[in-house]
Amino acid sequence: MSSLVSEIARRRTFAIISHPDAGKTTLTEKLLWFGGAIQVAGEVRARKADRHATSDWMELEKQRGISVTSSVMQFPYRRETADGKAQENIVNLLDTPGHEDFSEDTYRTLTAVDSAVMVIDSVNGVEAQTIKLLNVCRLRDTPILTFINKLDREGRSPIELLDEIEEVLQIQCAPMTWPIGMGKAFRGVYHLINDKVQLFDPHGEKGTAAILDGLDNPELDRILGSQAEELRIEIELVRGASHTFDKDAFLNGKQTPVYFGSAINNFGVQSLLDALCELSPPPLARNTDSRVVEPQEPKFTGFVFKIQANMDPRHRDRIAFVRVCSGRFERGMKLLHVSAGKTVAINNAITFMAQDRNTTEEAYAGDIIGVPNHGTIRLGDVFTEGEPLKFTGIPSFAPEFFRRARLNNPLKVKQLQKGLQQLAEEGATQMFRPLASNDLVLGAVGILQFDVVAHRLEHEYGVDAIFESHECATARWLKGTPAEIEKLIAKAGHNVALDGAGDHVYLAPSMVNLRLTQERFPELQFMETREIV
């Protein structure tokens, strides 16, 4: 039991959230590099050459230079603790799509982490997608570390950036490092906690030229000249005006420790990784419909937060990503697949390093394992050693955009149905079958998703499909007795469809129609979100 507790205590499971182009993929690469997980960081700007960013592995992502699915990467990281001891953590990094069209996949990924790193572009500050994602984290009081990136560019002043984060995101900022100059004048950072100056070297392998002790170090004046005295005055003001770090406030999602750096130059990344391991919580307790599951419980529990089709086109596979919530997983163990009511032996689970995969011999609470899925596992499904649990809080959103699928080759209907069904099981799109026709209607939270589906249908399933506009304003899941649902079908069946799980959905042609239908059928609930479990 003590080895179980110590293994779980080593785990840190987090996601990186940001607006597109804030440098999230670059930061992900550099964290992996500092963790020793990759030999060469696949620099994003060189993406059209042979080297693609390690976490952007799907063909479409490589073409577009954006992350459209969530990747999972695990690596060990050895660091020195504040008291000088060596400590090894197991880091589980979940890379999430930064593009606004993939918010639903990102949302679900954020249900599988214990903390998050928010990347802010020093030039652009807080942007729209950052606000949305932080609000998602806030629903679960997820602890947030902040990395203000691109200090090597001419950006906004650090005080202005912190003020904006506090005002717009309504979260206290506690600066842990402070920049010395910006843009061409950027010389490094001062560490407010341990009174050290870390000097910037854009040509050094790790971005650092030297680390000096103390602000009063005469060496600082020799290297920085007049900037040294400016730094001392600025730090005195910062200490007086800013919040000091409060670990309880951080763990409750009320305060964010802030680090400054330049991911593309490797600068500030190692400090962030050290802080992530030092400050972020180990795996946390999880709510179910019947009780709270503690990570140190000896029996295995886990839930599916993501399904990905065709991670390896050679294998035509589907993988269910399972967050381990408690206990220890061992290869070959028999687990209850709660929703199916069946016990299954898991012999070929895998761990991830983007698309690289290894068979998992064991995994602990906080880890992410991949379970091969032959169509029986769905988002939100739970695996246990026998207890019929359901983890709560894994949502599905009503789509905002709808398209009807049309085939250029009518003989490919079966392949189209199979492709749409499998891609919908990933949860980024939803498939609806109207009761009154043979149409296949696709719904998504972002318009770009239809391009992704068309591309993947063509390249992974050999189906050439066109997505035409479909007269639908919104979708609502129907909640009520079978008799009440039948009444609605009798009167307005042309607007009722079945979703991928076989549940009834009302596809409203307009918001006015939805309001009138709700008034006519007050006994039915028209649900905008549905908990997958």
Curated annotation (Swiss-Prot):
The keyword Protein biosynthesis applies. GTP binds at residues 18-25, 95-99, 149-152. GO terms for molecular function: GTP binding; GTPase activity; translation release factor activity, codon nonspecific; translation release factor activity, codon specific. PROSITE patterns: G_TR_1, G_TR_2. GO terms for biological process: regulation of translational termination. GO terms for cellular component: cytosol. Pfam families: EF-G_D2 (PF22042), GTP_EFTU (PF00009), RF3_C (PF16658). The keyword Protein biosynthesis applies. Keywords: Cytoplasm, GTP-binding, Nucleotide-binding, Protein biosynthesis. Disulfide bonds: none annotated. Residues 9-284 form the tr-type G domain. It is found in: Cytoplasm. InterPro entries: EF-G-like_DII, EFG_III/V, G_TR_CS, P-loop_NTPase, PrfC, RF3_C, RF3_dom_3_sf, RF3_GTP-bd. NCBIfam families: prfC, PRK00741.1, small_GTP. PANTHER family: PEPTIDE CHAIN RELEASE FACTOR RF3 (PTHR43556:SF2). Belongs to the TRAFAC class translation factor GTPase superfamily. Classic translation factor GTPase family. PrfC subfamily. Increases the formation of ribosomal termination complexes and stimulates activities of RF-1 and RF-2. It binds guanine nucleotides and has strong preference for UGA stop codons. It may interact directly with the ribosome. The stimulation of RF-1 and RF-2 is significantly reduced by GTP and GDP, but not by GMP. HAMAP family: Rel_fac_3. This is Peptide chain release factor 3. It comes from Cupriavidus necator (strain ATCC 17699 / DSM 428 / KCTC 22496 / NCIMB 10442 / H16 / Stanier 337) (Ralstonia eutropha).
